[in-house]
Amino acid sequence: MINNQTQEALYLDFDRARWAELRNSVPLTLSEADLTRLRGINERISLSEVTDIYLPLSRLLNLIVGARQQRGLVLNQFLGNKQPDSPYVISIAGSVAVGKSTTARILQALLKQWPEHPKVDLVTTDGFLYPLTELKRKGLLQRKGFPESYDTKMLIDFVSAVKSGAERVEVPLYSHIIYDRLPYERQVIQKPDILILEGLNVLQTGLDSPVDIRRPFVSDFVDFSIYVDADESLLKSWYIERFLQFRSSAFADENSYFRHYASLNDTQATETASQIWDGINGPNLRMNIQPTRERAHLILRKGADHLMNRVLLRK
């Protein structure tokens, strides 16, 4: 990570045991059945992980959102009129295979249990990837997941509309089976209390842009940002494990874009996944994703077996 002196200046550093103490009797509202539904492929997250890591985090976020709501009341009093309600936007960034989606789903399930903000929506940025035909036209198919492969204008228009209090905003849905947007399906967002936005590049700013530093970025609309972190050696091994599991699930689907991978043996599948990581996911991590890590308000650090072993919280 960053050097120790800079890290100490920017972050409060908690090991797992110290962080777990900050739960402060927040009740566990998820069952093992709930967790089975929420966890992703190749995730071994347990209820103890929820208790030790996610309950303290949900408590922190509840306090922060409450403070924002109080600030809104102060602003209304100062202006002499009620401003439109604006959702609190939480972004979750990190590498492919780090478990961002599982983190986002668990946080959504926990945050909606608090009576102060029961409506919590989750949107992934996958739906804002350019359609396959457009990626092929632009020569970006091998750069899918890199910043330039996203329809950034559509993404910014969406976040801006939600943040402005729009009554109804539609979001493109993405299918990992067909490896493309679903042309006739949309997710509808209707004035949530909290919006969780999960994706590879949601911490990016103009300093990182290969396109145009003058345009707004998703990070400009985010109130609290989380980065899920792990060593690249672990990330690559998790990606390969997930790829092997997909052979008998997603890849085996007759509509799968990657159906040709379903017949690979273990050696072939491992070699293929390793090549994909080395050619696409690894470079994207090092060039675009990891450099944004220290902009996050909170870093969740994973060790072996996907277990969080460290939490860094911005001072």
From Swiss-Prot:
Instruction: List the SUPFAM superfamilies.
Output: P-loop containing nucleoside triphosphate hydrolases
Tell me the gene name.
Answer: coaA
Gene3D superfamilies associated with the record:
P-loop containing nucleotide triphosphate hydrolases
For this record, an example GO cellular component is:
cytoplasm
Q: What InterPro entries is this protein classified in?
A: P-loop_NTPase (IPR027417), PanK (IPR004566), PRK/URK (IPR006083)
Top-level taxon of origin: Bacteria
Cite a single Pfam family from the UniProt record: PRK
Could you tell me where this protein is found in the cell? Cytoplasm
**What's the protein called, per UniProt?**
Pantothenate kinase
Q: Which organism is it from?
A: Shewanella amazonensis (strain ATCC BAA-1098 / SB2B)
Q: Where does ATP bind?
A: 94-101
The GO terms describing molecular function are: ATP binding; pantothenate kinase activity
What are its E.C. numbers? 2.7.1.33
Family, according to the entry, reads as follows: Belongs to the prokaryotic pantothenate kinase family.
